[in-house]
Amino acid sequence: MTRLVIIDYGMGNIRSVYQALRHAAPEADVRVISDAAEVKQADRVVLPGQGAMPDCMQFLRDSGLMQAVLDAAASKPLLGVCVGEQMLCDASDESHSARPTPGLGLIPGHCLRFRPEDMRLDDGSRLKIPHMGWNNVAQRLPHALWDKIPDQSMFYFVHSYHVAPRNPAHAVGVSTYGKPGTLPFTCAIARDNIFATQFHPEKSATHGLQLYRNFVNWQP
């Protein structure tokens, strides 16, 4: 039986992620853990995140789980969700100081805030930041976690920052938010045994459950 752990470091939509994974993969042993030893025993790891990235990184450090996550990322399938995706990158402009917040450095890239000037529409109205609600996701590159999910499927977002990966080959999913002509933003990244999404699979109905199911069955 596959043992899958959800990292509980005090910041994340843990209960919803747990329930969605249990529903998507009832044959898996899904656990919420806060002990580094249990991460070592796991076959697969989910890193959720919710709120501000500086706080998430601080809580992860304080929990004593940061090294366990880095060790797991070296060899085990790892899924980052929402701020959990942002934490995988080098740094984020979201910060409590004038300096960017360092991330885990697992996928080269930087987290950027949506630009207010891109939110003004032709009729003078403005889209709100954070980007909140359902939006389509274009599968920019093929990946096992897109299996049985149609291209341009809708997923649920709640965020003000987005990942800009340094290597375009790591951007496997994109979406758009802003005035017509605004460049797409990356909403799913992948490298080797790591996959991460800005959107919330646990809030994304059938397609979100399928993505979780694909993660449980993924053999990178």
Cite the ranges covered by each PLM segment.
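Extreme N-terminal starter segment of soluble prokaryotic enzymes
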Residues: M1-V5
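An anion/phosphate-binding loop that grips the pyrophosphate of nucleotide cofactors and donors
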Residues: A42
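Structural alpha-helical scaffold elements that stabilize or flank donor/cofactor-binding regions
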Residues: E38-V39, A72, A188
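Amide-donor transfer/coupling interface in amidating biosynthetic enzymes
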Residues: G109-P220
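Cysteine-nucleophile active-site neighborhood
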Residues: G51-H131
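Short helix-loop-beta junction
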Residues: R15, A20-A28
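Structural motif
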Residues: V46-P48
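A short, well-structured beta->alpha microelement
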Residues: E27-E38
